């Protein structure tokens, strides 16, 4: 069983940056990229779009998991065709990673009804916030297993090993001797209740 994660090419802005960051994080966990391409699919016949989808999912095997990043930047028709093809593989699970409300975007072809129809075809959800889940549930999204990804990790190339003035802040009645950090050049700063009020 493999885990695939979608990434749409030929889009920019926040969607493109976010999808790339999530895809990169997924690859560090061994996920495989499932590449989508933004284009005016209205010019493709259904048969032509089916051929494109066959190429997109060529590496998919039965029982695989696909994490679909929503919004994808594609049209409802394109995404619907993708879900249809994913469902052709026995046991394939679709996890919809819902990062924002597509129908609220000025550049989106989606209506809220389109979103609910598509997302209800997924097996599981990952939401960027609990409020996002509440909104979709209130508007017709089915109750299914889900995760809330409250605080994402952001990939960075910045080395954090050489910070100066390292400090460990504690709020407890304790002795600095209990923290043998002097040999690591880390200062222990203790806050009592009075000191803490100055921080808030």
Label each residue range with its predicted role.
Residues 8-11, 40-41, 71-74, 100-103, ...:
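Short, solvent-exposed loop/turn segments at secondary-structure junctions
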Residues 121-125, 166-169:
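Short active-site oxyanion
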Residues 44-121, 127-131:
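Extended catalytic core of nucleotide-activated donor transferases of GT-like folds
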Residues 29-35, 91, 186-189:
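A generic structural motif
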Residues 123-137, 141-159:
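Donor nucleotide-sugar binding/catalytic pocket of nucleotide-sugar-dependent glycosyltransferases
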Residues 197-200:
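Conserved small/polar residues in nucleotide/adenosyl-binding loops
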Residues 1-75:
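N-terminal pre-catalytic "stem/leader" segment of glycosyltransferase-like enzymes
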Residues 160-190:
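Conserved donor-binding/catalytic core segment of Leloir-type glycosyltransferases
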């Amino acid at each position: 069983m493999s885990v695939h994660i979608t990434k749409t090419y030929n889009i920019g802005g926040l969607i493109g940056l976010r999808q790339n960051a999530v895809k990169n994080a997924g690859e560090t966990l061994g996920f495989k990229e499932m590449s989508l391409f933004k284009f005016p699919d209205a010019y493709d016949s259904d048969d032509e779009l089916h051929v494109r989808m066959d190429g997109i999912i060529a590496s998919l095997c039965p029982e695989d998991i696909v994490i679909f990043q929503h919004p994808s930047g594609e049209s409802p028709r394109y995404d619907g065709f993708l879900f249809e093809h994913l469902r052709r593989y026995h046991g394939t699970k679709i996890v919809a990673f819902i990062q924002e409300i597509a129908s609220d975007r000025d550049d989106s072809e989606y209506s809220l009804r389109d979103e609910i129809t598509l997302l209800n075809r997924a097996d599981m959800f990952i939401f960027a916030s609990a409020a996002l889940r509440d909104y979709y549930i209130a508007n017709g999204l089915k109750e299914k297993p889900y995760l809330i990804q409250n605080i994402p990790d952001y990939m960075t190339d910045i080395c954090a090993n050489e910070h100066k003035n390292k400090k460990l802040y504690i709020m407890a009645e304790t002795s600095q001797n209990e923290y043998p950090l002097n040999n690591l050049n880390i200062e222990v700063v203790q806050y009592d209740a009075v000191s803490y009020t100055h921080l808030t």
